[in-house]
């Protein structure tokens, strides 16, 4: 049976196309992820995506976020702690066991297969540079 309930008016999204795609990707992840899942943020940046993933997987889930810049991991830690998440920092060469919580790895996301050996439900990456950070550190294809 077709849903005939009134639909909210469709409005044109504001902001740049990049801003809209980030919001869309976060919404998609929230539709896919369930409490208890394992999710990965390949580029922690300011922690926005990491925070969305942590909310989506809940306290029973696990989020692993990577970044090359210590400044990015500090920003991510601050954002998550403001929302009462406990953050664990992991050395860049340590395999992460499947356990609850948010884990931050100071390493390139290219090491993901050495650090995470369990099935992952969702992965996100905002490639580029850290806003306000060192612009010489940018994700580029090999």
Pin down the residues of each PLM region:
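S-adenosyl-L-methionine
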Residues: 1-38, 51, 55, 74-121
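A general structural motif
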Residues: 36, 60, 118-120
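Class I SAM-dependent methyltransferase core
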Residues: 41
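Conserved SAM-binding loop of SAM-dependent methyltransferases across substrates and taxa
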Residues: 46-60
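Conserved SAM-binding motif I beta-strand of class I
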Residues: 62-67
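Conserved Rossmann-like nucleotide-cofactor binding loop
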Residues: 71
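Mobile active-site "lid"/loop adjacent to the S-adenosyl-L-methionine
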Residues: 124-142
């Amino acid at each position: 049976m077709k849903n005939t309930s009134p639909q909210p008016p469709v409005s044109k999204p504001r902001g740049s196309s990049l801003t809209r795609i980030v919001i869309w990707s976060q919404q998609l992840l929230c539709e896919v992820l369930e409490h208890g899942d394992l999710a990965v943020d390949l580029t922690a940046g300011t922690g926005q995506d990491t925070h969305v993933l942590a909310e989506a997987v809940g306290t029973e889930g696990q989020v692993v976020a990577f970044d090359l810049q210590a400044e990015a991991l500090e920003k991510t830690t601050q954002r998550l702690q403001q929302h009462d998440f406990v953050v664990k920092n992991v050395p860049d060469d340590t395999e992460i066991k499947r356990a609850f919580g948010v884990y931050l790895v100071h390493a390139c996301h290219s090491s993901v297969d050495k650090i995470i050996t369990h099935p992952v439900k969702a992965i996100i990456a905002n490639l580029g540079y850290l806003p306000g950070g060192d612009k010489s550190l940018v994700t580029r294809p090999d």
